[in-house]
Regions:
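Extended, hydrophobic alpha-helical segments in both membrane/secreted and soluble proteins
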Residues: 1-6, 22-25
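Glycine- and acidic
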Residues: 4-12, 133-138
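Active-site proximal loops enriched in glycine and acidic residues that flank catalytic Cys/His/Asp
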Residues: 6, 40, 154-157
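Conserved catalytic core of two-metal-ion nucleotidyltransferases
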Residues: 11-75, 84, 88-96
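Small-residue (G/S/T/A) turn/hinge positions that recur once per unit in extracellular repeat modules
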Residues: 80-81
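Conserved nucleotidyltransferase catalytic core and NTase-mimicking acidic/glycine-rich helix/loop elements
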Residues: 85-182
Length: 182
């Protein structure tokens, strides 16, 4: 997944260059074996290439209308990390999200509810359950069976504590330092 955030003052010519760059970037990633995102979450798509104010509006929409898709997309967006350019734009979006969620807990509540949709793959007497049919027959979906609940649980706690930077491990350490986790 990738996106572009640009300053609100970017000119039309600069926007055209950003669009061309984003097309070239995705083509280059594909050429070295990085598969395109099946959900289309790529900077070459205009909805994933916005100004700071455009991203603020979209983020507010995700946080306020807590449909399953908005919660999934908003949660994923909280993992945003700058790879190049002005990190203050990412910081501004995080600050916007924190301020919004400090006053409106609906998104965090829905995020926590979503975690209950992914139960551990245990059956009777603690036996491991595997997929019964389809292309993954006999296998466990590790992402859905455990990793998702851990990463999103830590993410929800990190959002509430205002310590969202870094990986899941970094967030866990920050939560321990803040006394949220022991």
């Amino acid at each position: 997944d990738n996106a572009i955030i640009y300053d609100d003052s970017v000119s039309g010519d600069e926007l055209a260059r950003l669009e061309a760059f984003s097309q070239d970037l995705i083509a280059a990633l594909i050429s070295i074996g990085v598969p395109p995102c099946p959900g289309g979450i790529m900077a070459k798509n205009p909805e994933w290439r916005r100004s700071l104010s455009g991203w603020r509006q979209e983020l507010t929409r995700w946080l306020s209308a807590t449909t399953p898709d908005n919660v999934m997309t908003g949660s994923m967006f909280m993992d945003l990390r700058p790879l190049y350019g002005r990190t203050d734009l990412v910081d501004a979006l995080r600050t916007h999200a924190f301020h919004y969620m400090a006053n409106e807990q609906g998104f965090l509540v829905r995020m926590a509810q979503n975690m209950t949709n992914f139960a551990p793959p245990l059956g009777w007497f603690g036996r491991i359950k595997v997929e019964k049919s389809g292309p993954n027959r006999g296998q466990i979906d590790v992402k859905k069976a455990g990793i998702f609940a851990i990463t999103d649980g830590v993410k929800a706690l990190a959002i509430e504590a205002g310590r969202l930077q870094g990986s899941t491990h970094d967030r866990m350490e920050a939560l321990v330092d803040a006394g949220v986790l022991k």
